Amino acid sequence: MNIYTSPTRTPNIAPKSGQRPSLPMLATDERSTDKESPNEDREFVPCSSLDVRRIYPKGPLLVLPEKIYLYSEPTVKELLPFDVVINVAEEANDLRMQVPAVEYHHYRWEHDSQIALDLPSLTSIIHAATTKREKILIHCQCGLSRSATLIIAYIMKYHNLSLRHSYDLLKSRADKINPSIGLIFQLMEWEVALNAKTNVQANSYRKVP
């Protein structure tokens, strides 16, 4: 399944037939080939039942070329190479005091949290860091659901891709991601909000004499 077969989030900038959106690509060994769509979610598995260190055996995983990494709960040593760290797990330790040189954000999400109000500010934090070419780590406890949801939301907004595209893109680079169904529903609402904002902006532009 080609991850670019669905339309982009806004039809006015969709690629021509057969042409992929111009996203930078990662090296082959940094990507997975498994492409499962949000509508084909596996049963959600609680992090407590998994061997977390086997999910990312090589440490933080580069998932987007703008220096965005996905990971499970890190050690202090693993945080040191990063400029910005976003921890979106209620149960994960807040390590900001141990890494004073790192811009550290802790949003205490649970798997059933209402995250919609946090997505605009969090995706803006990520985007601001990318414009400064800073190295960004986004993590939760396992690195499968909450942190993946945030990265998908970022892709949707700043790469202007649909939820399906954004999910498949991240899935192709971190094949074990598995956002809970509740978070997927909230990403669907995020997509509606982004489309509504785009339509308002497009209409305003057309009214300019």
UniProtKB/Swiss-Prot annotation:
The active site is at residue 140. The keyword Disulfide bond applies. Coiled coil: none annotated. It comes from the Eukaryota. Keywords: Disulfide bond, Hydrolase, Protein phosphatase. InterPro entries: Dual-sp_phosphatase_cat-dom, Prot-tyrosine_phosphatase-like, Tyr_Pase_AS, Tyr_Pase_dom, TYR_PHOSPHATASE_DUAL_dom. GO terms for cellular component: cytoplasm; nucleus. GO terms for biological process: cell integrity MAPK cascade; negative regulation of MAPK cascade; signal transduction. 4-O-phospho-L-tyrosine binds at residue 111. Pfam families: DSPc. Disulfide bonds join 47-142. Belongs to the protein-tyrosine phosphatase family. Non-receptor class dual specificity subfamily. Mediates dephosphorylation of MAPK substrates such as SLT2, acquiring enhanced catalytic activity under oxidative conditions. This is Dual-specificity protein phosphatase SDP1. It comes from Saccharomyces cerevisiae (strain ATCC 204508 / S288c). The gene is SDP1.
